Amino acid sequence: MRKPSNQLGNKMFIINCKNYDEIAGDKIIKIAKISEKVSRKYKVPIAIAPPHHLIPLITKFKITVLAQHVDDKKVGSTTGFMVPEIVKKSKINGSIINHSEHRISEKEIISLVKRLQKLKLKTVLLSHIHI
């Protein structure tokens, strides 16, 4: 399996699957296969951010897999949270942070960006601020 590049520049096509029925169950596999083919054919990096429970179905494909969200929690008794250190061990390449449907505080953003960088995970930071 090809390991996704850490140096993607500033261009990447990201498919955030949200929680739509069109990707439920094995349907996510079809999207991953198509994404892998398109990425290879057009030499464009593609990332898929499926609902967390579907991630294991697509980690075998040669695409970047992103968590839709991670939490600023520690490894241990944190049931129901997506912990960055566990995310890394689950063959996930990075995470979306601060999506408009899952906003977090500035303090959490700063902490998570630092943690993901330390873990060498991709960070897709979204903001509603226009610069």
Say what each PLM segment does.
Residues M1-M82:
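Conserved N-terminal beta1-alpha1 strand-loop-helix module at the mouth
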Residues P4, Q117-L119:
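Small/flexible residues
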Residues I14, L66, I96, V124-L125:
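Conserved beta-strand positions in the central sheet of alpha/beta enzyme cores
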Residues V44, L119-L121:
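A short helix->loop->beta-strand "cap" motif at the edges of active sites that frequently abuts
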Residues I63-L116:
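Glycine/small-residue-rich loop that forms an oxyanion/phosphate-binding "nest" at active or ligand-binding sites
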Residues I129-I131:
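Conserved small/polar residues in nucleotide/adenosyl-binding loops
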